[in-house]
UniProtKB/Swiss-Prot annotation:
The enzyme's E.C. designation: 2.7.4.25
Binding annotation for ATP: 12-20
Identification of the protein by name: Cytidylate kinase
Annotated S-S bridges: none
Organism: Salmonella paratyphi B (strain ATCC BAA-1250 / SPB7)
NCBIfam families in alphabetical order: cmk (TIGR00017)
GO cellular component, one term: cytosol
Gene Ontology MF terms in the entry: ATP binding; CMP kinase activity; dCMP kinase activity
InterPro entries: Cytidylate_kin (IPR003136), Cytidylate_kinase_dom (IPR011994), P-loop_NTPase (IPR027417)
Cell compartments where the protein resides: Cytoplasm
Keyword Transmembrane helix set for record: no
Length: 227
C-alpha cells in the first residue's frame, strides 16, 4: 500500500505572514504548495477565459473539478500557473475578485474545489496555506500550524506594504477593517477561523519572519522525523 503524502497545514488570519512562511517552507523542504486563498480567483479566471456562465452552477462544477492549476515558489516569489500560463497578476484584478465572489456562493462549486484542493496532496509532501486547512481540508495532516499576530501588528504590516506600493493609508481605518474581518471569520457558522485542536499556535507579533520560519521548520522536522 502506497503511503499517503504528508501535509503541513498553515492556517491563520490575514496579515499574520502565512504566505511568506509557506513559500519558505515549500522551498526548504522541496514540497508542493497550495495557496487555497487563490483557488476561487483561479476558478473565476478560468471561467472568464472559457466564457463559462458565472451564474451557472452546473457549468462551473466540472470546471472546478478539473481545474488545471499549480503553485510554484521560486526565490520567495509565488507563481500561480493556470493551464500552463502564469496568471499571478491577472487573478488580482477587480474583475476576477468580483467573479470569485460569485462562484464561491455555489455549494457544489465549493465541494468540487474542496476535492480539487485535496488532490494537491502528492509526494514528497504538501504545504497548505489557508484558513481551514487543518480543520476542514486536511484534518488528518501530521503537522498543523496556526500562525497568528495581534490585529495592531497585522495592520502595521499591511500599512507598510501599501505604502511601499505608493498608496496613502490610514492606520486606524486599516485596523478597524482587520478587526471586523477577524470577527466575521472567527464567528462564522461554517468553518470558522480557529486553530485545530492539535495545531501549534505560533504568535508572530514579536518575531521576525526569519524566526517564524526557523521555529516552524524545526517543529515540522521534529514531528515528521525529517533530517
Amino acid at each position: 500500500m502506497t503511503a499517503i503524502a504528508p501535509v503541513i497545514t498553515i492556517d491563520g488570519p490575514s496579515g499574520a505572514g502565512k504566505g511568506t512562511l509557506c513559500k519558505a517552507m515549500a522551498e526548504a523542504l522541496q514540497w508542493h504548495l497550495l495557496d487555497s486563498g487563490a483557488i476561487y480567483r483561479v476558478l473565476a479566471l478560468a471561467a472568464l477565459h472559457h466564457h463559462v456562465d458565472l451564474a451557472s452552477e452546473d457549468a462551473l462544477v466540472p470546471l472546478a473539478s478539473h481545474l488545471d492549476v499549480r503553485f510554484v515558489s521560486t526565490d520567495g516569489n509565488l507563481e500561480v500557473i493556470l493551464e500552463g500560463e502564469d496568471v499571478s497578476g491577472e487573478i488580482r484584478t477587480q474583475e476576477v475578485a468580483n467573479a470569485a465572489s460569485q462562484v464561491a456562493a455555489f455549494p457544489r462549486v465549493r465541494e468540487a474545489l474542496l476535492r480539487r484542493q485535496r488532490a494537491f496532496r502528492e509526494a514528497p509532501g504538501l504545504i497548505a496555506d489557508g484558513r481551514d486547512m487543518g480543520t476542514v481540508v486536511f484534518p488528518d495532516a501530521p503537522v498543523k500550524i496556526f500562525l497568528d499576530a495581534s490585529s495592531e501588528e497585522r495592520a502595521h504590516r499591511r500599512m507598510l506594504q501599501l505604502q511601499e506600493n505608493g498608496f496613502s493609508v490610514n492606520f486606524e481605518r486599516l485596523l478597524a477593517e482587520i478587526k471586523e474581518r477577524d470577527d466575521r471569520d472567527r464567528n462564522r457558522a461554517v468553518a470558522p477561523l480557529v486553530p485545530a485542536a492539535d495545531a501549534l499556535v505560533l504568535d508572530s507579533t514579536r518575531l521576525s519572519i526569519e524566526q517564524v520560519i526557523e521555529k516552524a521548520l524545526q517543529y515540522a522536522r521534529q514531528k515528521l522525523a525529517l533530517a
